[in-house]
Amino acid sequence: MNPATGNGNSESTAQRPTRNWRIVDFVLRRGFEERDILPVRQVFALLLVFGPIYGAAMGSYNLIVGNRSLTEQVPQMLFSAIKVPMLLTITLLVAIPSFFVVNTLMGLRDDFRSSIRAIVSAQAGLTIILASLLPLTIFSYISFAYLSVSYQMAVLFNAAMFGLASVSAQMLLSRYYRSLIAKNSNHRLMVRLWIFVYAFVGIQTAYVLRPFIGSPNEPTTFFRRESFQNAYIQIWEMFNQVLYSI
């Protein structure tokens, strides 16, 4: 019997969270021991559930700010919902081989399986955090509509949301890595290396997979013809455009 309510098992059952929400809570609050890290299959399930949520929000820009109807904007929202899980998965898969080589050179190969489990669990946290930023993204789009803010600002805003989610996910990663660092201090260097490699690959991958938001002056497409360019040069140019427009 529940000592607080006195209603027995029925009250306990009514208050019991669903299995999926228990997993979400597990990702965000646990992770101090290796046994607390999620299986890879559950991580990818979370990625496929929460990634499209934020992707659809990103793709709603022209529906809220522009003059496009829901019918016209649904394809972009659908494309973005598909591409956010693609972005996170491709970035993970591209970054892992070099991370494996460096771990081997550092004498940490025996712990590599545990390292990957920690990384993919943090990836699940990143996806959940992104989905939690959906209300802020929608609210910002509404504000952009009233303030006549440029499309470039919307792109930079979403980049900032991904940055915020990534920083938060790295906090989770540090927590997941705690037992490994206690075992071998070289893992601390590996965490820092992973953060750098993941961010470097992720920025370029996101640029290749664009558009996620959809320019109001261009037709809706899954990819752009000029996708394979240097992301860092283009981001710098976009940042300068925003500064000069203020």
Question: Which residue ranges define each predicted feature?
Answer:
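Juxtamembrane interface elements at the cytosolic ends of transmembrane helices
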Residues: 5-31, 59-65, 169-180, 209
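Membrane-helix interface motif
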Residues: 56-70, 134-139, 209-218
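Long, intrinsically disordered, low-complexity regulatory segments adjacent to structured domains
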Residues: 193-194, 198-246
